[in-house]
C-alpha cells in the first residue's frame, strides 16, 4: 500500500500539530550512508551486554583497551581505563567536537561527562558534581584535570577577571600535585590525598570563583616510605632546585643528605623532571597570588621538616633519650625560631596531667623521643598543607553572586590489602558514604523518571548500605570510631592495652555486617569483606602531637608557626582533642551534605596493569577492580528497568529507515506525530510488545538485545543495497576462481609435495631416535623444502647472496636458512651472532652480513668442503645447537644454531661424499681451539621456550620423545562445493557441474523403475538425491492407466496411443556382488587415548572400513568403530568373491540402455588438523560427500538438462530414450575419472 501525502490538508496539519511536530523543517533529513563510521569495538555502553557478569565486563573492557578505546559507559557512568600513553584524544579539535553534543551523539569520553555536567547546570540551574574513583595509578587525577580543562574552555567569559579565575583554577593542579602527590610502587604520580574542587558560576555560566576541600592526606609518608618509593614531590623539587638564597638561609642540600628523603633510596623517577616541576610550582604560586613572604614561609617550614628528620637520639647515662648532634638541634631551633633547650625539652620530656591542676613531666626513651620528633614533622606538614589549601581558597573566593556550581571529587577508591588498618578503614568509610549518595541519588532519579513517564515497571531492589555507615560512624549505640576513641581514653598510656579494650568493644557489638576475629574484625562493605587488624589501630586514631610540642610551637617567635598552630594549650584541660576518626567523620558528613545538593556524574577509573605498559592488560587485576568498583551492580541497576530510553524525535531520526511506512529510498515520509512514527517502527520491525513501552515523551526498550536487533537491521539496510549490486559480479568472479582452483587442486594432489614428505621421513632415520624433538618439527604439515632463502634463484635476495659469496654455476644449493654462530671474543663472554647458512652439493658456507660505511656487505665468512667435515656434533636434548667437526689446525670448529637442523642434516647426508658421522650425546663436542676438544653441556632448565647459550652451557626445555615421528598429515578442511556460474545462469556445484552424489561406498545399484526396494527407498537423504538425478523411463504396456505411471513421464513426452505396439524394456542387470570385507590382523597392542581412537590387541582380527594416506585406518570391531594406526595392523588377503550368474542377453531388437553402475567417489578426507571422526552409520558417510545445489525450484541440475532430449516420434521412442540415457551415463563415467 502506497503512502499518500496531503501536505495541504488542514486536518493533516492539525494532526501533526497535535502530535507535537513543531514545523516541517524539524523532520529528519534524508538518510545517507556514513562513510566515516568507525567500527565499534565491543559495546560502548555496558548496559548493552547480552550477559551481565564481571567476566563479561572485563572482556569488553579488554577489547576496547586493545582497540585504543579507553572509555565505556554504564548509562551515565563513565568507565575509564588508563592507557599509559598519549592517544591524541585531548586535543582542542576533539574538545571542540564535544561542545553542545548529547552524550549519545559522540563516543564515550571524559569531555562528554564534562559537557553533560556543564549543560545540565546551565539548562536546569542545578548544582553538578563529578565523582571520580579508582585505585592509585588508574587515572583519577588526569580525569579531573581534563574536566577542568573542558570547563575552562567552554565556559566563555572574555573579561580579565573571568580569565584570571580560570588560570588560577588550572594552576591549582601543579601546586597541589607537588605537595600532595608522591611516587609509589604502583604510580609515579600518585595522589596521596583526596580533594573536592567546587567551581562557582554566575547566571551566564562563567566561572567566578572556586574552593577546594582536602581529605585524608597521607602525612605518615613525610617520615617514612617503603623501598623504591619517595616522599612528596615538593621535597625533591626543593632540594634539587632551590635557589642559592634559600640554600644559604635554610641550609638546603641535596636529597641524599636528609633522612626523610633518602630512607627509601629513591631520588629520581622516570618521566618526572623535578627541576622543571619546581619552576611550575613557583609559577603556580605566583598565579594564585602567593606573596614572596608567604613563599619564604612555606619553604622555611619544609626546611624545618627536613632537618627534623636528621635529629637523632641516643641513650643517655640515665637511660633516657639524649640528642646525638647538638648542631642539628641549633639549626632546627633557628628555623622554628625557638630556644634550642626548649626544643630538646619538648622532644625528650613528656607532659602528663593525671589530675586537674597537676602536671607531671616524664623523661622519654629513645623510641618515644623519635616518635615525638616524627609527630612534630608530620604536624608541621599536615597543617602546612591545610594552610596552602585555605590560601588557594582565599584567592579563588567568588567576588560576585554565585548561581550554581560544578564539583569535582578526586578521592581514593576502595582499598583491600593483605593487612588493613586505620587508614584503610577511613578510606573505605568515605567510599561507603559515596556509595550511599549513589544509592539515594541515582536510584531515586531512575524511579522518578519511570513515574514521570508513566511507565509500568518493577521496583528496583538494592542494598542500602546505611547500616554499614552507621556501624562505623554511629555514636549511640557506639560505632567503630566511637569505640576506638573510648578505648584510647581508658588506656591512653599503653597502645597495646588500648587495642585490647577496643577489641573487647568490637566483640560486644551486634551487627550483621561486623564479624570479630582473633586480633581483627571483618566489615562487610558493599564492595566486599575487608579484614582490619587491631594492632596499633587506636594509636593511629589518637592525636600524637603532645602538649609539650604544642607549647613549643606557641613559644615560637615566627608568626607563620603561630598561623599553622593557632590553638592555645590549656594544661588544666584533660579533654582529649578530636581524634583522626572524628575529623574524618566530620569532613565525610560535610562532603555528603554538599554532594546531596548536586546532580552527580560518576567516573570509574581502572588500572590495566602494574607495569605502566600501554599494551599489557592484566585480566585478574582488572577483574578485581571491576568487582570492588561495583561495575556489575551498576549495570544491573541500570538494566533493572529499561536498558535504553530515548525521546520520540531522536528514536525516529535513528530508525525511520526500518519501516516502509516511514521511509522510502532513504527519505522520511511519515506525516504523523513522532510518537505514532515510533510505534509504527516498533510494529514493523516485529519487536514484541513486552520489550518496549512508550512514555509521555520517550520510548523505552527493555533488553539490549532488542536495541542490537534494531541497530543490526539499520546496518543491514545499506548492506542489502550494496549486495544487490555486487551479486552478479561476484558470480562471474566465482566462476573464474573456482575453475582455476579445481584445476590446481587436482594437479597438487597428484604432483606436488610427495618428494618433500619422503625427505622428511628420511630425516627421522638420520636422527635414529637419539635426539629429542621439538613439537613444531614433527607437525604433519612440515615439509623439507631445502632452499628457503632462494639461493638457486636467478633474481631476488637469494641471488644476491649467491653472487656475493661466489657460489659457482656448478654448485647447487640444497639447503639455506638463517642461523647463529657462536663468536668467541677475547676477555668477553661468547655470544651468538646472526649468520646465513648455505649447504651446496660440495661446500658448507657460513655467510656474514656486516655494515660497511652505511651499506650492508655480504661475505662468506667460512666455507668448508663437505668432504672435510669429519663429524657433526649434537646433543640428545631438543636444542638447535650443533658443531661441525672440521678438525682444522688453524681455526676452531664452528658451533652453530639452526632451527631447521634436522633438515640440514638430512640434506648434508644426501650430498656428502663418504660416510656421514652424526655424533649425538649428552653434550656437544667441538674444538673450541685448534686441536683442543671441549664439551658444551645442555641443561633442560630454560625458563622459557627459547633456548639460550651461556658459559659453555645451552639451556633448553624438555622436548618430545626421541622416537617421535611426524604427526599424521592434516587434512584440508572440507569445503562445500561452490556454485559454478556461466553467464547469468547458476549451475549446481560439485565435480563436473552437477550435484555430487552420496559418498556411501557400500551403496547398491541405482533404483530402477519397477524394481524392488533400495537404499533410496528407506533413506530420505538418498531418496532426495536419487529423485534429483532420475531419468525418465517409458512405462510398461498397460501401465498408462495408472496415475503414478502417468505422472512419471515428463511433460514434453507424447502420450502413448492405445493402438501403438512398443516392445517392453529389457530386464535390469543383476545387482553387483557385495563388496568383500577387508580384514586385517592386529600386530601390536594399541590403547586409544581419544574418543575417535580404537583400542586393539595383538592377534585380533578387525574389519577395515576405510583407508587413509595419513597412517590411520577406520576399523570396526564388535566394540565399535574408530581409527587405528595402519602400522599396527596387517591386511589379510580377501576371500575370492562369489560370481553371480549373468542373466540371459536381451532380445536383439532392444538396445540395452541400462549401462553399468557408475563408480562411487571416494569419501572425503577428515577435517584438517585432526583424525576424521568415526562414521558409524551410512547416513553420516553420505553427509560427508553430499553435494550442494543452488538451483532450488528452478531445475533439477545439469543431469536433468542432459536427460531432457525430446522424443522425435512415437515409434522408437523407447530405443531413442534408452540410447540417450546410455550416452549420458557414459559421460558421467568419464567425469568420475576426475575424482
UniProtKB/Swiss-Prot annotation:
Composition skew (Low complexity), residue ranges: 982-1046
One GO biological process term: endocytosis
One MF annotation (Gene Ontology) recorded for this entry: microfilament motor activity
PROSITE patterns xrefs: MYOSIN_MOTOR, SH3, TH1
Gene Ontology CC annotations of this record: actin cortical patch; actin cytoskeleton; cell cortex of cell tip; cell tip; cytoplasm; mating projection tip; medial cortex; myosin I complex
Signal sequence residues: none
Residue intervals of the IQ domain: 719-739, 740-765
Compartments, record wording: Cytoplasm, Cytoskeleton, Actin patch
Domain SH3: 1075-1134
Domain TH1, chain residue ranges per copy: 773-962
Region of interest: Actin-binding: 405-487
Domain of life, per lineage: Eukaryota
Protein function: Type-I myosin implicated in the organization of the actin cytoskeleton. Required for proper actin cytoskeleton polarization. At the cell cortex, assembles in patch-like structures together with proteins from the actin-polymerizing machinery and promotes actin assembly. Functions as actin nucleation-promoting factor (NPF) for the Arp2/3 complex.
Free-text domain note: The myosin motor domain displays actin-stimulated ATPase activity and generates a mechanochemical force. The tail domain participates in molecular interactions that specify the role of the motor domain. It is composed of several tail homology (TH) domains, namely a putative phospholipid-binding myosin tail domain (also named TH1), an Ala- and Pro-rich domain (TH2), followed by an SH3 domain and a C-terminal acidic domain (TH3).
Stated family: Belongs to the TRAFAC class myosin-kinesin ATPase superfamily. Myosin family.
Name this polypeptide is given: Myosin-1
Organism taxonomic ancestry: Eukaryota, Fungi, Dikarya, Ascomycota, Pezizomycotina
UniProt gene name: myo-1
Amino acid at each position: 500500500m502506497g503512502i499518500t501525502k496531503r501536505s495541504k490538508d488542514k486536518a493533516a496539519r492539525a494532526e501533526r500539530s497535535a502530535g507535537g511536530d513543531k514545523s516541517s523543517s524539524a523532520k529528519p533529513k534524508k538518510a545517507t550512508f556514513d562513510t566515516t563510521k568507525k567500527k565499534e569495538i565491543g559495546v560502548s555502553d555496558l548496559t548493552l551486554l547480552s550477559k551481565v557478569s564481571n567476566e563479561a565486563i572485563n572482556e569488553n573492557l579488554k577489547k576496547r583497551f586493545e582497540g585504543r578505546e579507553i572509555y565505556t559507559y554504564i548509562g551515565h557512568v563513565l568507565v575509564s581505563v588508563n592507557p599509559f600513553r598519549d592517544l591524541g584524544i585531548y586535543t582542542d579539535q576533539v574538545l571542540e567536537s564535544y561542545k553542545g553534543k548529547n552524550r549519545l551523539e559522540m563516543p564515550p569520553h571524559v569531555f562528554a561527562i564534562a559537557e553533560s555536567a556543564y549543560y545540565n547546570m546551565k539548562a536546569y540551574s542545578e548544582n553538578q558534581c563529578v565523582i571520580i574513583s579508582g585505585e592509585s595509578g588508574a587515572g583519577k587525577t588526569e580525569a579531573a584535570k581534563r574536566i577542568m580543562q573542558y570547563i575552562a574552555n567552554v565556559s566563555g567569559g572574555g573579561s580579565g577577571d573571568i580569565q584570571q579565575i580560570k588560570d588560577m583554577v588550572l594552576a591549582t593542579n601543579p601546586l597541589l600535585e607537588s605537595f600532595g602527590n608522591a611516587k609509589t610502587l604502583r604510580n609515579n604520580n600518585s595522589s596521596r590525598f583526596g580533594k573536592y574542587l567546587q567551581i562557582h558560576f554566575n547566571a551566564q555560566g562563567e566561572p567566578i570563583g572556586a574552593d577546594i576541600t582536602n581529605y585524608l592526606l597521607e602525612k605518615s609518608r613525610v617520615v617514612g616510605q617503603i623501598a623504591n618509593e619517595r616522599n612528596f614531590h615538593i621535597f625533591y623539587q626543593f632540594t634539587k632546585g632551590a635557589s642559592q638564597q634559600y640554600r644559604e638561609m635554610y641550609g638546603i642540600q641535596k636529597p641524599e643528605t636528609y633522612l626523610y628523603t633518602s630512607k627509601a633510596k629513591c631520588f629520581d623517577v622516570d618521566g618526572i623532571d623535578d627541576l622543571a616541576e619546581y619552576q611550575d610550582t613557583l609559577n603556580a604560586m605566583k598565579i594564585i597570588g602567593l606573596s614572596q613572604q608567604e613563599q619564604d614561609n612555606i619553604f622555611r617550614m619544609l626546611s624545618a621538616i627536613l632537618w627534623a628528620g636528621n635529629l637523632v637520639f641516643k641513650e643517655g647515662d640515665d637511660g633516657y633519650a639524649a640528642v646525638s648532634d647538638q648542631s642539628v638541634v641549633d639549626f632546627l631551633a633557628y628555623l622554628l625560631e625557638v630556644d634550642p633547650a626548649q626544643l630538646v625539652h619538648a622532644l625528650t620530656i613528656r607532659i602528663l596531667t593525671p589530675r586537674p591542676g597537676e602536671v607531671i613531666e616524664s623523661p622519654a626513651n629513645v623510641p618515644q623521643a623519635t616518635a615525638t620528633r616524627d609527630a612534630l614533622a608530620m604536624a608541621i606538614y599536615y597543617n602546612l598543607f591545610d594552610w596552602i589549601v585555605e590560601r588557594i581558597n582565599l584567592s579563588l573566593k567568588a567576588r560576585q553572586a554565585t548561581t550554581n556550581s560544578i564539583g569535582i571529587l578526586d578521592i581514593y577508591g576502595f582499598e583491600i590489602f593483605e593487612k588493613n588498618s586505620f587508614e584503610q578503614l577511613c578510606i573505605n568509610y568515605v567510599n561507603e558514604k559515596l556509595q550511599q549518595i549513589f544509592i539515594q541519588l541515582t536510584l531515586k532519579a531512575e524511579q522518578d523518571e519511570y513515574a514521570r513517564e508513566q511507565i509500568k515497571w518493577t521496583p528496583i531492589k538494592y542494598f542500602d548500605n546505611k547500616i554499614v555507615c552507621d556501624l562505623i560512624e554511629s555514636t549511640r549505640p557506639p560505632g567503630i570510631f566511637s569505640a576506638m576513641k573510648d578505648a584510647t581514653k581508658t588506656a591512653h598510656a599503653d597502645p597495646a592495652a588500648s587495642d585490647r579494650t577496643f577489641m573487647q568493644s568490637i566483640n560486644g557489638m551486634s551487627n550483621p555486617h561486623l564479624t570479630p576475629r582473633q586480633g581483627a574484625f571483618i566489615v562487610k562493605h558493599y564492595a566486599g569483606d575487608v579484614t582490619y587488624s587491631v594492632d596499633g589501630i587506636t594509636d593511629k586514631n589518637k592525636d600524637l602531637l603532645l602538649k609539650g610540642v604544642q607549647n613549643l610551637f606557641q613559644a615560637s617567635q615566627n608568626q607563620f608557626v603561630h598561623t599553622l598552630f593557632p590553638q592555645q594549650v590549656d594544661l588544666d584541660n584533660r579533654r582529649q582533642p578530636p581524634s583522626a576518626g572524628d575529623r574524618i567523620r566530620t569532613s565525610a558528613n560535610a562532603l555528603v551534605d554538599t554532594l546531596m545538593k548536586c546532580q552527580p556524574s560518576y567516573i570509574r577509573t581502572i588500572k590495566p596493569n602494574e607495569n605502566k605498559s600501554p599494551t599489557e592488560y592484566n585480566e585478574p587485576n582488572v577483574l578485581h577492580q571491576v568487582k570492588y568498583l561495583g561495575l556489575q551492580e551498576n549495570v544491573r541497576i541500570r538494566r533493572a528497568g529499561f536498558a535504553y530510553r530515548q525521546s520520540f524525535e531522536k528514536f525516529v531520526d535513528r530508525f525511520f529507515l526500518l519501516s516502509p511506512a516511514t521511509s522510502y529510498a532513504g527519505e522520511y515520509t511519515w506525516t504523523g506525530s513522532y510518537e505514532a512514527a515510533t510505534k509504527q517502527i516498533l510494529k514493523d520491525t516485529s519487536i514484541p510488545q513486552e520489550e518496549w513501552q512508550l512514555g509521555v515523551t520517550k520510548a523505552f526498550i527493555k533488553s539490549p538485545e532488542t536495541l542490537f536487533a534494531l541497530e543490526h537491521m539499520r546496518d543491514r539496510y545499506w548492506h542489502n543495497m550494496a549486495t544487490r549490486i555486487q551479486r552478479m559480479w561476484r558470480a562471474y568472479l566465482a566462476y573464474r576462481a573456482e575453475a582455476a582452483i579445481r584445476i590446481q587442486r587436482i594437479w597438487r594432489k597428484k604432483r606436488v609435495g610427495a618428494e618433500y614428505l619422503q625427505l622428511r621421513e628420511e630425516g627421522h632415520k638420520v636422527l635414529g631416535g637419539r635426539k629429542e624433538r621439538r613439537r613444531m618439527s614433527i607437525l604433519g604439515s612440515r615439509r623439507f623444502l631445502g632452499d628457503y632463502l632462494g639461493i638457486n634463484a636467478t633474481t631476488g635476495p637469494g641471488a644476491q647472496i649467491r653472487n656475493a659469496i661466489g657460489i659457482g654455476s656448478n654448485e647447487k644449493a640444497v639447503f639455506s636458512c638463517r642461523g647463529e654462530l657462536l663468536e668467541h671474543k677475547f676477555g668477553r663472554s661468547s655470544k651468538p651472532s646472526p649468520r646465513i647458512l648455505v649447504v651446496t652439493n660440495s661446500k658448507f658456507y657460513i655467510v656474514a652480513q656486516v655494515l660497511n660505511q652505511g651499506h650492508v656487505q655480504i661475505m662468506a665468512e667460512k666455507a668448508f668442503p663437505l668432504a672435510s667435515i669429519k663429524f657433526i656434533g649434537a646433543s640428545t636434548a631438543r636444542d638447535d645447537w650443533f658443531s661441525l667437526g672440521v678438525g682444522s689446525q688453524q681455526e676452531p670448529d664452528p658451533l652453530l644454531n639452526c632451527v631447521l637442523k634436522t633438515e640440514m642434516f638430512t640434506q648434508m647426508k644426501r650430498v656428502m661424499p663418504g660416510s656421514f658421522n652424526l655424533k649425538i650425546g649428552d653434550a656437544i663436542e667441538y674444538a673450541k681451539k685448534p686441536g683442543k676438544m671441549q664439551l658444551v653441556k645442555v641443561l633442560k632448565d630454560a625458563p622459557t621456550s627459547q633456548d639460550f647459550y651461556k658459559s659453555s652451557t645451552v639451556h633448553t626445555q624438555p622436548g618430545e620423545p626421541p622416537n617421535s615421528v611426524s604427526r599424521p598429515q592434516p587434512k584440508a578442511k572440507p569445503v562445500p562445493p561452490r556454485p559454478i556460474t556461466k553467464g547469468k545462469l547458476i549451475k549446481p556445484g560439485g565435480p563436473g557441474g552437477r550435484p555430487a552424489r552420496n559418498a556411501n561406498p557400500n551403496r547398491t545399484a541405482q533404483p530402477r523403475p519397477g524394481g524392488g526396494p533400495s537404499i533410496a527407498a528407506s533413506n530420505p537423504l538418498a531418496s532426495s538425491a536419487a529423485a534429483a538425478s532420475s531419468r525418465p523411463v517409458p512405462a510398461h504396456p498397460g501401465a498408462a492407466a495408472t496415475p503414478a505411471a502417468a505422472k512419471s513421464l515428463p511433460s514434453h513426452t507424447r502420450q502413448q496411443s492405445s493402438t501403438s505396439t512398443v516392445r517392453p524394456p529389457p530386464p535390469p542387470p543383476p545387482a553387483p556382488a557385495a563388496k568383500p570385507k577387508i580384514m586385517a590382523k592386529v600386530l601390536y597392542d594399541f590403547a586409544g587415548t581419544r574418543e575417535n581412537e580404537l583400542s586393539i590387541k595383538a592377534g585380533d582380527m578387525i574389519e577395515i572400513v576405510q583407508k587413509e594416506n595419513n597412517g590411520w585406518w577406520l576399523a570396526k570391531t564388535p566394540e565399535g568403530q574408530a581409527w587405528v594406526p595402519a602400522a599396527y595392523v596387517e591386511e589379510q588377503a580377501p576371500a575370492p568373491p562369489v560370481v553371480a550368474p549373468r542373466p540371459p542377453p536381451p532380445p536383439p531388437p532392444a538396445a540395452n540402455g541400462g549401462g553399468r553402475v557408475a563408480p562411487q567417489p571416494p569419501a572425503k578426507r577428515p577435517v584438517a588438523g585432526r583424525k576424521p571422526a568415526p562414521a558409524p552409520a551410512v547416513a553420516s558417510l553420505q553427509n560427508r560427500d553430499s553435494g550442494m545445489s543452488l538451483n532450488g525450484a528452478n531445475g533439477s541440475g545439469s543431469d536433468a538438462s542432459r536427460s531432457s532430449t525430446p522424443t522425435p516420434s512415437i515409434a522408437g521412442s523407447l530405443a531413442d530414450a534408452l540410447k540417450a540415457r546410455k550416452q549420458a551415463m557414459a559421460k558421467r563415467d568419464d567425469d568420475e575419472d576426475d575424482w
